[in-house]
Amino acid sequence: MRKDIHPNYQEVLFHDTNADVFFLTRSTVKTKTTREYEGSEYPYYPLDISSASHPFYTGEQRKTSTEGRVASFNKRFGAFGGRKKAADTDAAE
């Protein structure tokens, strides 16, 4: 068997910077910094988003960004949608 072909699987401290939550789990991620957590020194890896701050898991859906995207789409491509004729709108009423 060949030696040194597997990555180093170790305990790593992940930090969700948006929610300020720490997770201690095992990973093969390579880090340059370490941090003390609960009395022990661990490799430290900051995260922008995790299950603690992701809108799907927190239930805080952001509708404003979606509405803005739809409005932007309609503004750009609304003219291509084909306009209803006056006869069609009168018949609908």
From Swiss-Prot:
<dbReference type="InterPro" id="IPR002150">
    <property type="entry name" value="Ribosomal_bL31"/>
</dbReference>
<dbReference type="GO" id="GO:0003735">
    <property type="term" value="F:structural constituent of ribosome"/>
</dbReference>
<dbReference type="Pfam" id="PF01197">
    <property type="entry name" value="Ribosomal_L31"/>
</dbReference>
<keyword id="KW-0689">Ribosomal protein</keyword>
<dbReference type="GO" id="GO:1990904">
    <property type="term" value="C:ribonucleoprotein complex"/>
</dbReference>
<protein>
    <recommendedName>
        <fullName>Large ribosomal subunit protein bL31B</fullName>
    </recommendedName>
</protein>
<dbReference type="InterPro" id="IPR034704">
    <property type="entry name" value="Ribosomal_bL28/bL31-like_sf"/>
</dbReference>
<dbReference type="InterPro" id="IPR042105">
    <property type="entry name" value="Ribosomal_bL31_sf"/>
</dbReference>
<comment type="similarity">
    <text>Belongs to the bacterial ribosomal protein bL31 family. Type B subfamily.</text>
</comment>
<keyword id="KW-0687">Ribonucleoprotein</keyword>
<dbReference type="GO" id="GO:0006412">
    <property type="term" value="P:translation"/>
</dbReference>
<comment type="subunit">
    <text>Part of the 50S ribosomal subunit.</text>
</comment>
<dbReference type="GO" id="GO:0005840">
    <property type="term" value="C:ribosome"/>
</dbReference>
<dbReference type="InterPro" id="IPR027493">
    <property type="entry name" value="Ribosomal_bL31_B"/>
</dbReference>
